Swiss-Prot record:
InterPro entries: Alpha/beta_knot_MTases, tRNA_m1G_MeTrfase_C_sf, tRNA_m1G_MeTrfase_TrmD, tRNA_m1G_MTases_N, tRNA_MeTrfase_TRMD/TRM10. This is tRNA (guanine-N(1)-)-methyltransferase. Belongs to the RNA methyltransferase TrmD family. One of its GO terms (biological process) is tRNA N1-guanine methylation. It holds the Pfam family tRNA_m1G_MT. Keywords: Cytoplasm, Methyltransferase, S-adenosyl-L-methionine, Transferase, tRNA processing. Coiled coil: none annotated. SUPFAM superfamilies: alpha/beta knot. It comes from Legionella pneumophila (strain Paris). S-adenosyl-L-methionine binds at G115, L135, G136, D137, F138, V139, L140. It is an enzyme of class 2 (transferase). GO terms for molecular function: tRNA (guanine(37)-N1)-methyltransferase activity.
Length: 250
């Protein structure tokens, strides 16, 4: 059964970009189904208007309750019963890799609501939204790009969506750490060499090197992540070696 993901958006053309690359192949293979619904199709106002001035005054416009509610109701009727409705907002929780992994495993249908203007009527959020998600502490012009980011991140976790089974497993954050460095041909260019261990063919040593680099990169770039995972004694030794090799106390 395909994972069903939907988007409520005033600009469905933007979402069409998801039909290319890895995500596009997953759609063609029947691993995932993507649908869009435009609130303008449920507007009773002249010129399909979906926004109005905010009560209390202030700049900008607010997306109206009626067309949004009708679009959400219609979309949910076409999706699975376990569908969750997600409003994309900088006020939402920052979603982590493990959250998305669970969605891919459970094939949890999601309906993303992409806001525009100054936002959407709060009554939609309070009564028709299950969760609010954010990409981080910054503001976009609309929720469409955020929806595409989450859709892409979820799809690559679906078995069969990537060319190699290990590709997603090696991604940063999959095991709580950042990914190790990657190299390809040529072995030497502009005086820059690929590490010898990767050229030697000893798979045990290669895996040890990759684990050390993964631990080390996490320590250098995201030390906060190391505080959230339980390191084995081998991991502690590898991290100590990395620190020593990079000028830290040995």
């Amino acid at each position: 059964m395909a994972l069903h993901l939907g988007v409520i958006t005033l600009l469905p053309e933007i979402i069409q970009g998801i039909h290319y690359g890895v995500t596009g192949r997953a759609i063609e293979q029947g691993l995932v189904k993507i649908d869009c619904w435009n609130p303008r199709d449920w507007s009773s106002r002249p010129y399909k208007q979906v926004d109005d001035k905010p009560y209390g005054g202030g700049p900008g416009m607010v997306m109206m309750y009626e067309p949004l509610h009708a679009a959400i109701k219609h979309a949910r009727s076409e999706m699975k019963e376990n569908c969750k409705t997600i409003y994309l907002s900088p006020q939402g929780k920052v979603v982590r890799q493990n959250d998305l992994k669970q969605i891919a495993i459970q094939k949890q249908s999601l309906l993303f609501v992409a806001g525009r203007y100054e936002g959407i009527d709060e009554r939609i959020i309070n009564h028709h939204i299950d969760e609010e998600w954010s990409l981080g502490d910054f503001v976009l012009s609309g929720g469409e790009l955020a929806a595409m980011v989450f859709i892409d991140a979820i799809i690559r976790l679906i078995p069969g969506s990537l060319g190699h089974l290990g590709s997603a497993e090696q991604d940063s954050f999959m095991n709580g750490l950042l990914d190790c460095p990657h190299y390809t041909r040529p072995a030497t260019i502009n005086g820059l060499d690929v590490p010898d261990v990767l050229l030697g063919g000893n798979h045990k040593e290669i895996e040890r090197w990759r684990r050390k680099q993964s631990l080390g990169k996490t320590w250098l770039k995201r030390p906060d992540l190391l505080e959230k995972i339980q390191l084995s004694e081998t991991d502690k030794q590898l991290l100590a070696e990395f620190k020593c090799e990079h000028g830290d106390s040995c």
